[in-house]
């Protein structure tokens, strides 16, 4: 396994990587529960149904999903405006004890913190493994999806 120079990482990333390296930390105990670690590039693991992980799609499909949450796409809307308002109402905020970053959480979606590049008071969405991101902003009508071709560690 390649060693990572923690000093070369930005401070927030350095902290989470140091916590992950500590077998006694809550971060390590929470994220290293699968042995051997999953390889999200293997078709067998992509076919498995695992909550909160392995949502596999194209960037266009992810953006269209978020667009259908905030309005009609091809005549279909997934959530009513009332349900969306309830799902995006802030329920909690604070420091994530696992990832060691500030978070805001709605009933059904993540909410951006003010330092997130996609921040808007009305935006909602979730980052994903490896740097993927899906979000929407009902106030502007923007829906966005970014995914990678492969999941790479580090």
PLM feature spans:
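Catalytic loop of the DD-peptidase/beta-lactamase superfamily, centered on the K-T-G motif
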Residues: 1-154
